[in-house]
Amino acid sequence: MRLRHVVSSLDLTRDDYFRIFELADKFSNVKKLNYLSGKVVSLAFFEPSTRTAQSFHTAAIKLGADVIGFASEESTSIAKGENLADTIRMLNNYSNCIVMRHKFDGAALFASEISDIPIINAGDGKHEHPTQALIDLYTIYKVFGEIDGRTFGLLGDLKYARTVNSLLRALTRFKPKKVFLISPSQLKVRREILDGLNYPVIETENPYDVIQDIDVLYVTRIQKERFVDEVEYEKVKESYVVDLKLVNMMKKDGIILHPLPRVTEIDRKVDKTTNAKYFYQASLAVPLRMALFYEVLGERKDD
């Protein structure tokens, strides 16, 4: 069954995740295919992006699709006063799928409710980033061969990081042993996210108390652009630094992930450790997003 919109991690079933992982494996060494020949993908990035925009662009091209779009709100008619609904309707006329990033929470859901073509959420405000969660889980699957039964530690900005929200929600499709939420009190996971989880969660402010139990340490930067009050940002901006001291306390086969960009929250000396998998994680973005495009737009025998 073809996927329609991918607005939230909860739009995917457990079977969907594994099917996309299997497809990503098949696409991992592909140079160029024509599966999406004749299709047009719109990259509607109302908010800046480097990795996400470029990896989606590359994924579409490698499947044979044509790509149109924009990289900032300033380059669109929204800068002239056009509303989001009209922009989405216009993009429906030009393309077969819209990959959308926006600064407002819920923008992707709003777009999906008025769009006749699939919407893929590439990040909406501090709400969600479901394709990043797909990459995160795919990395874990590739490293360990499984996701169930693992202990996770999410560290850093757990309040404003949309990648955290999507990963926590995606994990409801699996069976994590437990999840440690490690953050300053000002940056704890929001209650509406916690209330929807179906696995054990433990909140703490000290990573040293739990690091020895963690299989997957997921690190996020403190997101200055989400803070209304810069004074509050200054208080927490360097709350944690993952350094060699912390890494040396991890399990030997434990891994460190990061959605990137990294600022100061992971010491660069950590990059050379066997635990550091964040650059490998980033390398999986293109085949994973190829798989997602194929799920949304590819021809199916059951269509």
Curated annotation (Swiss-Prot):
Q: Where does L-aspartate bind?
A: 80, 162, 221
Pathway in which the depicted protein is active? Pyrimidine metabolism; UMP biosynthesis via de novo pathway; (S)-dihydroorotate from bicarbonate: step 2/3
Gene Ontology terms: biological process: 'de novo' pyrimidine nucleobase biosynthetic process; 'de novo' UMP biosynthetic process; amino acid metabolic process
**Stored PROSITE patterns:** CARBAMOYLTRANSFERASE (PS00097)
Catalytic activity entry: carbamoyl phosphate + L-aspartate = N-carbamoyl-L-aspartate + phosphate + H(+)
> Which positions are annotated as binding carbamoyl phosphate?
51-52, 101, 129, 132, 260-261
Domain of life according to the entry: Archaea
Return the broad EC class: transferase
Q: What Enzyme Commission number(s) apply to this enzyme?
A: 2.1.3.2
Query: NCBIfam families in the record, alphabetically?
Result: asp_carb_tr, PRK00856.1
Its biological function? Catalyzes the condensation of carbamoyl phosphate and aspartate to form carbamoyl aspartate and inorganic phosphate, the committed step in the de novo pyrimidine nucleotide biosynthesis pathway.
Q: Which PANTHER family match?
A: ASPARTATE CARBAMOYLTRANSFERASE, ORNITHINE CARBAMOYLTRANSFERASE, MITOCHONDRIAL
Q: What is this protein called?
A: Aspartate carbamoyltransferase catalytic subunit
